[in-house]
Amino acid sequence: MKISVLQMPVAIGAREINMAALRRMLEDAMADAPDIVVLPELWDIGFFPRPLEKYVDENGAKAKTLLSLLAKQYHVHIVGGSVAVKIGDYIANRCYVFDRNGDLVADYDKTHLFSPAKEDKFFRKGDHRAVFSLDGVKCAVAVCYDLRFPELFRRYALDDAAVIFLPSAWPTARIEHWATLSQARAVENQVFFVAVNGSGAFANGMPLGGRSAIIDPWGVRLAEADEREAILTAEIDLSVRDEIKRTIDVFHDRREELY
């Protein structure tokens, strides 16, 4: 299975510019014939313009229309990062996943909202996990700050997810946390971990740190970006996961009765 990551330049509050960047980068990425393409958090408007209500996507219609069209056009699975979606009287930081036919196969609302940036004052936290199959491979998704909560990823591992995607908007100031925790989640859960950041800046001017990476269950970075706009592509060998489970069977040895 081949995975491409789009470390997009995200313009604050400029949906049309960001959609154009997505189209351009996806077209370039398809030269490597990926099976799955993954986008960063809030790629549509950035993290996040004020007043947020002015920029939200009503029922996710704009994002879903574009992502479905592109998935079908290029016959590729798309893990659609996340977008700011207005649903009735609340706003969600939501990831949509589309299959090669352009059909919606999963959605996930960010579970842990970043209170230091007052994200919890503007968005509603999610209430479900998301596990889904792409080409017969069980996958899961989380978003950004979720990375700091290992319990979620262990639940995904217990759900037998082989690949976990993490669309994010992570700052340069804490980028070493990003690198360390992403690698740890891959190793401790014996999964392929696809961590996708943006490039550019937050609405407050703080720079995004980039460093998107595709990491195997041994913790090896199969591909990694710097802070600039980038397309990463790596082939993942799912037999590696089987190998590590045979070699170090942590799920057999864990003491669930104690924790």
Question: What feature does the model see in each segment?
Answer:
Residues 1-14, 38, 94, 107, ...:
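Active-site-proximal beta-strand elements of phosphoester/diester hydrolases
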Residues 6, 108, 132, 196, ...:
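Hydrophobic residues at beta-strand termini and immediately following loops
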Residues 15-101, 107, 171-191:
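Cys-nucleophile CN-hydrolase/nitrilase-fold catalytic domain and related Cys-dependent amidase chemistry
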Residues 45, 52, 96, 108-114, ...:
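Short beta->alpha transition motifs characteristic of CBS
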Residues 60-79, 148-232:
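CN hydrolase (nitrilase-like) catalytic-core segments centered on the catalytic cysteine
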Residues 80-82, 94-97, 130, 212-214, ...:
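Short beta-strand scaffold segments in enzyme catalytic cores
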Residues 86-159, 172-180, 245-250:
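Active-site catalytic loop in hydrolytic enzyme cores
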Residues 242-259:
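A conserved C-terminal secondary-structure "cap"
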